[in-house]
């Protein structure tokens, strides 16, 4: 049975939720599931915007047929070829061999690589600035390279001001029938998942996102239809402002993310003392995590959110504790920058981790200010925090 939502007089959401998938891209936990959004326009010609993941293909196809009500499907626009949005292309074309597929040249190359065969006579290749008229609706095509794949584009309905934004403005989380942003408490229930989605999936490509936002600023956008998460039909400035923060790597809030690596609880105890001292000084926006038991996607999200980081780690085989090193490597890979960082190191002998973390941050990441006064403990903290000044490239032993 179809499960659809009418967005406007002639535009329908025909996507589906997936609550069974545990890991998005087989790496990021999604305890609230995820939606795969697809949209169907009923004009003089019928137009389907993107498809859906194979896991929800049956529901997706039922939705499409339920809205078409026997009409043929004239066009399929593919904005993004990643399989969670393109895996059902062949199933659509098997049921609707009359359909012409509209996308860009690189997208058709990727479709062929993935095995989504579209015959040449059934292709319309578009580029930046091209338009296609389907009746009263005219769609313009805008390139969005590296947001977050090279072939990505967005489609803009010049008639209604609807932006089909591909993976931009998306979020983790199943919709559960509530399609629009004003049908949910976005700040409370969706913002963290939207941030975690952006920072871990798109975060590396901030400059490309800013290019797309620059193009979008020239459009009179009335509604945003992303491929994941809620549809934005009001307060669009809110999500655009969030994207500007994330894409420019500016923190959303003044606060401290305190991440610790502790084998026997001693480094954790030191981190707890620091958190208490910060609270006494009036900094109560503190968020403390064990790097060994917290999925990195949550740490990355909060690293983008807050202005200050504290990294507290034991020395491990004369190096950085592996889970902490993974976190550092992820921050580097996702291009995090413009943060103030404090360091706590622990070692019972040959305590090298503080200097190694400092060296990593200063040599591999942009605009990271590492405080020169670090904290060294030997095995466990006694008598208060010990400060080591002017370290470079390693901490002094005390």
What does each of the following model-derived ranges do?
Residues 148-152, 160, 168-203, 247-252:
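Active-site-proximal loop/helix segment associated with metal-binding centers of metalloenzymes
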Residues 225-252, 326:
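Short N-terminal or domain-adjacent regulatory/targeting segments
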Residues 49-51, 73-81, 101-104, 163-167, ...:
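Active-site neighborhood of phospho(di)ester-bond hydrolases with catalytic His/Asp-centered motifs
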Residues 175, 186-224, 229-231, 273-289, ...:
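FMN-binding flavodoxin-like domain, especially the glycine-rich phosphate-binding loop
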Residues 45-47, 75, 137, 161-164, ...:
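Structural motif
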Residues 4-65, 154-157, 162-165, 267:
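Conserved beta-strand hairpin/beta-sheet module of binuclear metal-dependent hydrolase folds
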């Amino acid at each position: 049975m179809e499960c659809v939502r009418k967005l406007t007089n002639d535009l329908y959401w025909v996507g589906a939720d997936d609550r069974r998938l545990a890991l998005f891209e087989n790496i990021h936990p999604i305890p609230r599931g995820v939606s795969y959004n697809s949209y169907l326009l009923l004009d003089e010609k019928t137009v389907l915007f993107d498809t859906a993941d194979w896991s929800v293909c049956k529901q997706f196809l039922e939705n499409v047929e339920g809205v078409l009500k026997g009409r043929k499907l004239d066009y399929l626009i593919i904005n993004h070829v990643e399989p969670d949005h393109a895996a059902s292309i062949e199933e659509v074309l098997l049921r609707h061999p009359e359909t012409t597929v509209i996308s860009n040249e690189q997208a058709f190359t990727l479709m062929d690589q993935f095995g989504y065969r579209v015959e040449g006579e059934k292709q319309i290749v578009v580029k930046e600035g091209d338009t296609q008229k389907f009746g009263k609706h005219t769609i313009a095509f805008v390139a969005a390279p590296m947001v977050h794949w090279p072939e990505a584009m967005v489609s803009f309905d010049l008639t209604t001001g609807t932006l089909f934004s591909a993976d931009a403005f998306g979020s983790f989380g199943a919709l559960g029938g509530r399609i629009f942003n004003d049908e949910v408490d976005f700040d409370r229930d969706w913002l963290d998942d939207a941030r975690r989605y952006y920072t871990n999936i798109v975060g590396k490509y901030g400059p490309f996102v800013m290019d797309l936002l620059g193009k979008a600023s020239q459009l009179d956008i009335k509604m945003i239809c992303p491929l994941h998460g809620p549809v934005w039909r009001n307060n669009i400035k809110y999500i655009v402002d969030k994207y500007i923060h994330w894409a420019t790597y500016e923190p959303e809030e003044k606060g401290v993310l305190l991440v610790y690596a502790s084998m026997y609880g001693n480094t954790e105890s030191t981190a707890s003392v620091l958190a208490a001292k910060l609270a006494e000084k009036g900094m109560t926006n503190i968020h403390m995590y064990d790097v060994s038991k917290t999925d990195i996607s949550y740490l990355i999200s909060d690293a983008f959110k807050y202005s200050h980081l504290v990294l507290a780690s034991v020395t491990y085989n004369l190096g950085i504790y592996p889970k902490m090193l993974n976190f550092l490597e992820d921050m580097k890979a996702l291009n995090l920058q413009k943060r103030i960082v404090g360091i706590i190191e622990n070692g019972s002998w040959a305590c090298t981790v503080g200097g190694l973390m400092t060296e990593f941050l200063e040599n591999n990441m942009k605009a990271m200010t590492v405080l020169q006064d670090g904290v060294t403990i030997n095995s466990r903290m006694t008598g208060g925090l010990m400060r080591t000044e002017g370290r470079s490239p390693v901490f002094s032993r005390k």
